[in-house]
Amino acid sequence: MVIEKKINTASVSLKSLDPLDHSLELLHFGFRGLTVAADHFLEARGLSRVHHRILYVIARADAISIGELATTLGVSNQALHRPLSHLFEQALVQYTREPGRHRFKLLALSETGTALEAEVTELERRTLREALATTDTDGQDAWRRVMLALAEQLN
């Protein structure tokens, strides 16, 4: 569910307990700003951000098993079951059996799933493109270095 209430982030008066708190708030609100248009688009179709994460990863994998998908997303197979089943029911995701290892399902997007994933991801790209346009190349590179350093915490 997408919360409709607008937030003026400049007027949010949270007490800082540490000098980095403002940066944490910007990261939180920035991510919400990045995904809000996509979240509305998905919600109108009975889907959510978790469905988009699944579609996004499958679209970029040549062939991915359910276990590999769960590992990539950082969730358990059990946590993946319900949203993935929903995507199967909506015919957005399909599977084939892995040759020689018939227990394993290899996931792929259907034509409809491919089109939906592309449209949702483009909404996020557009938002990111607009935000990156507010700074120069050095600022964009610095932002990418910070994001990379944060992502490295997963390794």
What are these regions (language model features)?
Residues 82:
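DNA-binding alpha-helical recognition surfaces that contact promoter or target DNA
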